[in-house]
Regions:
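GST superfamily/GST-like fold recognition
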Residues: 174-178
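GST-like domain detector, emphasizing the conserved glutathione-binding G-site
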Residues: 6-147
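Extracellular-facing binding/remodeling surfaces
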Residues: 168-173
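Amphipathic alpha-helical packing segments from all-alpha helical-bundle domains
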Residues: 149-167
Length: 178
């Protein structure tokens, strides 16, 4: 199946670390679409993203990233998913089919990222011994962990969950009718 996709889509390849939440987001997207694309695992735990050829390919030194046939690199999971949906896998749509629904989905994606995913990531990076001197994803390693960010992250996530619960009291889904 992957070989067949390689023939159809050329040399596009997803570089990923399956255990990372962002990478899982792309994998869930592809699973929902019932699609596969060629993939190469990058071992983030061993710092492989900081070594060549990956370091030159993606200046953010983060996963996942998608390399297109023309060598263009797209990083950030939502950007990858949006590109794949618009260019290769339009159905079933996950980003909406009308301007109103697209805007509504974007709104909720932003809220989930800003009020949930980012605070959670910051809390983990400021708590776990694995991230000492590595609180920012990528190449910076001079920023120290701050316990206050852990507490703030927990409070922000709790508030987001309350807002989602209130929304779901009146709606069957976060966005749309299916």
């Amino acid at each position: 199946m992957v070989f067949l996709l390689f023939l159809i889509m050329g040399k596009m390849k997803l570089y990923n670390f399956t255990l990372a939440p962002n990478g899982r987001r792309v994998k869930i997207f592809l699973k929902f679409k019932n699609k596969e694309i060629p993939e190469q695992e990058i071992n983030v735990r061993e710092g492989e993203q900081f070594k060549e050829p990956f370091k030159s390919m993606n200046p953010f030194n983060c996963v996942p990233f998608l390399q297109l046939d023309d060598k263009t690199i797209i990083s950030e999971s939502i950007s990858i998913c949006r590109y794949l949906e618009e260019e290769h896998f339009p159905e079933p749509t996950l980003f909406g089919s009308t301007p109103k629904m697209k805007a509504y989905i974007d709104m909720w994606n932003r809220r989930l990222e800003l009020d949930g995913y980012s605070p959670l990531g910051n809390a983990i990076r400021n708590k776990s011994s694995f991230f000492v001197n590595r609180v920012l994803a990528g190449t910076r390693n001079d920023i120290k962990q701050m316990p206050e960010i852990v507490e703030r992250g927990i409070q922000m996530i709790e508030l987001l969950f309350q807002r989602i619960d209130q929304h779901l009291e009146k709606n069957k889904f976060i966005c749309g009718e299916q």
